[in-house]
Regions:
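Membrane-anchoring alpha-helices and their flanking helix-loop junctions
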Residues: 1-57, 77-133
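Membrane-interface loop-to-helix entry segments
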Residues: 57-73
Length: 133
């Protein structure tokens, strides 16, 4: 991707943002793979619940309620850093807003499905950032 940026914009060469952005993208993708593995059969691509779905609260989910969305934010923070312009920042802010709306909808569905168990889990863990206790 960096080669593409340099090819399309020959005067553009900022190694620190490129390196930092790629590191963030790799971390985000790796985080995403770990999260999907931890979810296993509980992975649902939409903000819905399934009849056999179980509440996952271990692994990365013991720290934050939505590590999958956190992985997306880390990945696209890397994209924004690589782009090194206002468009990348605006896109990232829009993504944050959209994900928060989606998370709220998903959490309402999880409260309906898991009730008090999910509400207790919400009290113990942060939405996207671990709670410090």
């Amino acid at each position: 991707m960096g080669a593409l940026v340099i090819t399309l914009y020959p005067g553009f060469y900022m190694p620190i943002p490129l390196i930092a952005g790629f590191i963030l993208m790799i971390v985000g993708m790796g985080f995403n793979l770990v999260v999907r593995k931890e979810l296993g059969k509980n992975w649902v691509p939409l903000s819905k619940t399934t009849p056999n779905q179980e509440l996952v609260t271990d692994g990365l989910y013991s720290r934050v309620r939505h590590p999958f969305y956190l992985s997306i934010l880390i990945l696209f923070t890397g994209v924004a850093v690589i782009s090194w312009n206002w468009y990348g920042l605006i896109f990232l802010m829009a993504l944050v807003g959209g994900l928060i709306i989606r998370i709220k909808k998903e959490e309402n569905n999880l409260i309906i499905k898991f009730g008090d168990e999910y509400q207790e889990y919400m009290e113990k863990t942060g939405m996207l950032i671990p709670k410090i206790t």
